[in-house]
Design a protein with these regions (language model features):
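Short alpha-helical segment of the dimerization/phosphotransfer core of two-component systems
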Residues: 22-27
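Short helix-loop "hinge" at the ATP-lid/N-box region of the Bergerat-fold HATPase_c
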Residues: 105-107
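Short conserved segments within the C-terminal catalytic ATPase subdomain
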Residues: 68-79
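Glycine-rich/acidic phosphate-handling loop/turn and adjacent ATP-lid/helix
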Residues: 129-147
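Short beta-strand/loop element within the Bergerat-fold HATPase_c
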Residues: 113-125
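Detector for a conserved hydrophobic position within an alpha-helical segment of the HATPase_c
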Residues: 156-157
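Short flexible loop/turn segments at helix-to-beta-strand junctions
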Residues: 42-52, 89
Length: 181
């Protein structure tokens, strides 16, 4: 950023600096993904935080994701979010990394002209969060090593939950499922 300020007058330099900034951000993201993957794949047992109401745990996370996406000009459909008086036990540090990873993936791969859909669901035994986004034609998933989603899956398993994803009707969906305690 400092270099950009000092080189404002030179369009070619700005083009190169923007490219370099993009690559630095890509590297930072991959380092974060590797850290997540390492943490998630550890054999050391994790402690789950005390069980709490799902609204208390997930309300702020989902609200923050909505706000971040809308600030970046994404349309968000959060009509499907609802909460019931049930409790889950999670590791908040893992949950923070999971939502950060999913938000980063939306920025990297989603079409910001199509809405990001967020919804919650309940069964007798589980609470789930689903996030779906339109897939942008000029952003390819082939560039991805899939480390981020593998990390999310591993962190979910370590919290006794599960993660699944699917691609259908031009949307990419991620589902996080947590056991109700």
């Amino acid at each position: 950023d400092v270099m950009k300020l000092e080189n404002e007058a030179y369009a070619e330099n700005m083009k190169n600096l923007n490219f370099i900034s993009e690559k630095v951000l890509d590297i930072r993201t991959q380092v974060d993904n590797l850290l997540d993957f390492s943490i998630a794949g550890s054999q050391r047992p994790i402690e789950l935080d005390a069980s709490m109401d799902v609204e208390y745990i997930f309300g702020d996370y989902l609200s923050d994701v909505c706000a971040q996406l809308m600030k970046s000009n994404y349309e968000v459909d959060a009509e499907g979010i609802s909460f019931k008086q049930v409790k889950v036990a999670v590791n908040m540090a893992f949950l923070t990394r999971i939502f950060s990873n999913l938000t980063d993936n939306i920025y990297k791969y989603a079409d910001n002209k199509k809405p990001v859909v967020m919804k919650t669901a309940f069964t007798k035994k589980t609470f789930s969060v689903e996030i779906g986004n339109g897939v942008c034609d000029n952003k390819t998933l082939l560039k991805s090593a899939g480390i981020g989603l593998k990390s999310v899956d591993a962190m979910m398993q370590r919290m006794n939950g599960s993660m699944s994803f699917k691609r259908e009707h031009g949307k990419f969906w991620v589902k996080l499922e947590f056991p109700i305690v």
